[in-house]
């Protein structure tokens, strides 16, 4: 009975009477209120990080050798390991760009690094299951697939996104002038941010760290705003038929992550189906591809709120780079790509030495990138 309660993409009614209630009575108003609070805190955090980043410019330039795009990629990668999340690091990259600390290309590679670092989170959760005595291959496969798919997509994105940024094509497009939005948010945010800047007299690094802490809290609150999605017993058969279509899984991954703004959260929705054998590892690959595109929605929102056209262009280059790479793979060589990814995951998990080499490499690579 517990299994039949599962996750629905619509909130299941408690009973027939609940289903007949008006829509406004079925809406979770506390979650809407929490979403509004989360959005306010997100804008406040971004404002504090932006103000802090401007004052941090000399410190970052003196203490960190962010001289090229490789350095910023490694920095973003390790930064995401430290905070166990990619979105705050991507937001930090945009505030660094806005402060003139790094260039658009460096911002682009720092965001790429943040995605690589964020992929480690799912892998880390898998390690916790292994320590609890679960099967190593089963526990680590989702995290390894996420890391592998994300890494391969980002390789394509580096090439395509860099070409887009250097060509200036994205400069012809605009999401509109953010000045009106900025003026509205200034009225709501400035009194609170002024407390940190003028009353508490926090230094630049303090403002940035407070903003980073608030934005980490914000993404946690965003997760709590999500509707409780379940898959009812009657829907399992229908869903299990859909998972064998790569394009549908790609679109599903894009849609779910668009709502959740987190790859790890959207992947967790598949866990009940995976445990019951309805979703195999190969079915998850196109889902992860789609998730890797729409996970940048929160970063795009941050770029718009900064009212910085270069920041918007950078995020658009990243999203288009990942999307074009994913579509090429899906339409041209998906089955070969699928076999290659599964073989790599199997190789990593079959021996302790292979797993150790993989773990060593994902920490060594960002360090080497920083030192280049």
Predicted regions and their residues:
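Intrinsically disordered, low-complexity non-transmembrane regions of multi-pass membrane transporters
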Residues: 1-33, 134-137, 169-199, 224-244, ...
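Helix-loop-helix hairpins and the membrane-proximal interhelical loops
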Residues: 17-73, 191-250
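Transmembrane helical cores of multi-pass ion-transport proteins
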Residues: 19-28, 52-79, 83, 88-100, ...
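Hydrophobic core segments of alpha-helical transmembrane domains in multi-pass membrane transport
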Residues: 33-48, 75-77, 149-162, 207-223, ...
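Alpha-helical transmembrane segments of multi-pass membrane proteins, especially transporters
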Residues: 35, 39, 64, 68, ...
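Membrane-interfacial helix-loop connectors
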Residues: 80-115, 126-132, 256-323
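Membrane-interface helix-loop-helix junctions at boundaries between adjacent transmembrane segments
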Residues: 104, 120-155, 165-180
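C-terminal transmembrane helix pair
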Residues: 133-155, 296-372
């Amino acid at each position: 009975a517990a299994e039949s309660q599962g996750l629905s993409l619509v909130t299941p009614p408690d009973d027939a009477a609940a289903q007949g209630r008006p829509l406004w009575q079925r809406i979770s108003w506390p979650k809407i209120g929490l979403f509004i609070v989360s959005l306010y805190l997100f804008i406040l955090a971004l404002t504090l990080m932006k103000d802090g980043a401007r004052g941090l410019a000399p410190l970052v330039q003196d203490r960190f050798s962010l001289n090229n795009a490789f350095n910023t990629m490694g920095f973003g990668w390790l930064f995401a390991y430290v905070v166990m999340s990619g979105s705050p690091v991507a937001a930090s990259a945009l505030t660094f760009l806005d402060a003139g600390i790094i260039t658009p290309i460096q911002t682009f590679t720092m965001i790429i690094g943040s995605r690589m670092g964020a992929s480690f989170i799912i892998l880390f959760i898998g390690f916790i299951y292994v320590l609890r005595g679960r099967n190593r291959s089963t526990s680590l496969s989702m995290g390894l697939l996420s890391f592998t798919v994300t890494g391969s997509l980002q390789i394509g994105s580096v090439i395509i996104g860099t070409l887009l940024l250097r060509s200036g094509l994205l400069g012809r497009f605009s999401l509109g002038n953010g000045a009106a939005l900025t003026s509205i948010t200034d009225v709501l945010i400035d009194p609170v941010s002024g407390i940190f800047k003028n009353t508490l007299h926090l230094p630049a690094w303090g403002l940035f760290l407070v903003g980073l802490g608030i934005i980490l809290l914000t993404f946690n609150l965003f997760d709590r705003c999500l509707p409780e999605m379940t898959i009812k017993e009657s829907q399992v058969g229908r869903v299990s038929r859909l998972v064998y279509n790569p394009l549908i899984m790609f679109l599903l991954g894009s849609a779910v992550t668009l709502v959740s703004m987190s790859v790890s959260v959207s992947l967790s929705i598949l866990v009940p189906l995976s445990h019951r054998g309805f979703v195999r590892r190969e079915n998850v690959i196109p889902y992860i591809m789609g998730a890797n595109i729409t996970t940048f929605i929160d970063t795009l929102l941050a770029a718009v709120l900064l009212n910085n056209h270069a920041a918007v262009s950078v995020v658009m280059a990243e999203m288009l780079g990942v999307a074009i790479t994913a579509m090429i793979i899906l339409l041209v060589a998906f089955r070969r790509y699928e076999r290659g990814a599964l073989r790599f995951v199997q190789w990593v998990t079959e021996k302790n030495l292979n797993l150790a080499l993989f773990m060593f490499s994902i920490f060594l690579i960002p360090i080497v990138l920083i030192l280049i």
